[in-house]
């Protein structure tokens, strides 16, 4: 919206390191705190591939995305502390901004010792709805363990690939994911369901995936 121009970096990204941005974010989070009983909040921040390359670049010059995301997250975490909220974000920006590949493209035994890392009280949510092999989950959880000891996993109940749910993919991916999460002692997992590709599948069709998640959490 035109009214947001002053705090826009690019079409779908807020401009970091701008006080008006953090004033806006604090108002958003204050509203969340007032209207929900939980003190936990998922801040999103995923797939911001153009971070720092829009108005931020024009006003400040080039800065590495890994530095921008770390400093921005630190500011937002400070706001969450002020409001007594416990935040989490999708983890992909901490991986893609620190490397040259895609989220899942890093080689095994990747060394993250020189990467920019989040504050300890910011949960990193590793999201993966795609892989049915435990090796990928092991690789990704090894990488996440180097970034944070506050790691959460998010899988999915597949209702977003057409007019019917994809239960076979839900089963294969969830079985591989949750068995690996147990091996790595991940304490918290989420089951997501998205509305991509026209949202043609009835939402209630996600329920078998939720039951599978619940079953595999304990068996």
Task: List the model feature ranges, each with a label.
Residues 1, 14-17, 31, 144:
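Generic low-polarity alpha-helical segments
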Residues 1, 49-55:
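Short acidic/His/Gly/Ser-rich catalytic and metal-binding motifs that mark active-site loops
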Residues 1-5, 206:
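Short, flexible, mixed-charge acidic loops at enzyme active sites
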Residues 7-14, 50, 131, 158-160:
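Conserved radical SAM core fold
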Residues 11-17, 60-65:
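Second-shell loop/turn segments in exported
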Residues 22-34, 38-40, 47, 58-219:
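Substrate-binding groove of N-acetylhexosamine-processing glycoside hydrolases
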């Amino acid at each position: 919206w035109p009214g947001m121009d002053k705090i826009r970096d690019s079409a779908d990204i807020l401009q970091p390191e701008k006080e008006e941005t953090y004033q806006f974010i604090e108002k958003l989070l204050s509203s969340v705190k007032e209207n929900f009983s939980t003190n936990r909040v998922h801040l999103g921040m995923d797939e911001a591939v153009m971070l720092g390359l829009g108005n931020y670049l024009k006003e400040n010059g080039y800065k590495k995305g890994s530095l921008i995301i770390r400093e921005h997250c630190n500011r937002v975490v400070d706001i969450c502390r002020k409001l007594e909220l416990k935040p989490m974000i999708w983890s992909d920006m901490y991986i893609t901004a620190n490397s040259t590949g895609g989220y899942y493209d890093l080689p095994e035994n990747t060394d993250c010792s020189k990467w920019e890392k989040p504050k300890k009280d910011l949960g990193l949510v590793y999201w993966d709805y795609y892989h049915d092999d435990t090796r990928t989950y092991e690789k990704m959880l090894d990488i996440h363990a180097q970034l944070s000891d506050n790691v959460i996993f998010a899988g999915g109940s597949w209702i977003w690939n057409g007019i019917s749910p994809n239960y076979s993919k839900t089963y294969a991916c969830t079985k591989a994911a949750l068995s690996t999460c147990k091996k790595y002692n991940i304490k918290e997992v989420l089951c997501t369901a998205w509305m991509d590709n026209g949202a043609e599948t009835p939402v209630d069709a996600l329920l078998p995936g939720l039951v599978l998640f619940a079953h595999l959490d304990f068996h």
